[in-house]
Amino acid sequence: SVLAQDDSKPKPPTEATKQVNAAWLERLDFANKQDFADAQQGFIEALPGGGVVKNDKGDIVWDPTKFRFIGVDKDCPDTVNPSLWRMSQLLSLTGLFKTSDRIFQVRGYDLSVITFIEGEKGVIVVDPCVSAETAKAALALYRKHAGDKPVTGVIYTHSHVDHFGGVRGVTTDEDVSSGKCVIVAPEGFTEEAVSENVMAGNAMGRRASYMYGNVIPRGPQGTLGAGLGTTTSSGTVTLIEPTKFIEKTGEKLTIDGLEFDFLMAPGSEAPAEFHFYIPALKALCTAENACHTLHNFYTLRGAKTRDSKKWAAYLTQ
C-alpha cells in the first residue's frame, strides 16, 4: 500500500527527538578530544583502496566506504544521539597503527581489531577478524611496513566469531600441524564457538539483523553501525582448532620468545575468554572486557547472558 511504502522511508526527526538529542550536548563534555588524540596515536598508514576487500571471485566482502558520511570533522545530525555520533567518529579512525614497542594494530578491516605482536622470529596474531579475506588484507598491510615476518602464533582471546573467523587468512593448517604456528585459546573455546556460531548461529544471525539494523540503509537517518564497530565482513569464516588451551589464571606460556601471563575470564563478554599480560613489553590485553562502550551483559540476538559480577571481578583482580 501507499501507506506501507511511506512508512518504509526515513522521516525527519520530531521536535521531541531534536530536543532530547540536543540535551546530550549539554550533559556530556564534547569539548574533551582526548579520545580522538588517543585513537590517532601511532598512526602509520590508511587502509588501501578505501578499505574495500574482495574475495578470490572479485566479490566485495568488506566495504567501509558506505560509512564515509561519518567523519571527525562533521557535525552531528539532529537525527542522531551526539554520544553515538562521537563513538562512530572514533570508529572512523582506521588504518595501521603502532600502539607500542613491537605491537601493531589494524583497525577498520572488520568489526574487531586485529593485533600483531612481534616475537623473536616472527609475529603473533591476536584475534584475526571475522573473515579470512579481511585478516589476510590486514596482515599484508602490516607486512608492508614490518617485512615478511612468518606468523609464529595466533591467539583467540574469546569464542566470538570476529576473533577467530579469519584465521586461515594469516596461517595455514600445514604450519599449525607442523608446529611452525601455535594457536592459543581459553579452556572451553571450541565448545562455546560451536554452540554460539553453529548450533545457535542461524537463529542468532536473524536476530542480529534486528539488533544491528543490518538491512537499514547507511546514513544519518539509517544506521551508523553496530556500536562496537561498523558491521561484520561477509567473507570466508574459518576455524583452526587451538593447539594449546589455557586452563587457569597465572598460567604462563612462551610464544616465539615472549612470555605471556594469562588471566582466565570465563562468563564475561564471552563464555570462554581470557586476558593476558606480556611482562617484557609491559602490555596488557583485556579482550573485549574493557572497551569504551557500555558493557554488553545481554545481547538482543540471543547470545548467552554474561555474569556482571564475574566480569567486574576479572577487571579488578
Label the model's feature ranges:
Residues 1-2:
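Bacterial N-terminal signal peptides
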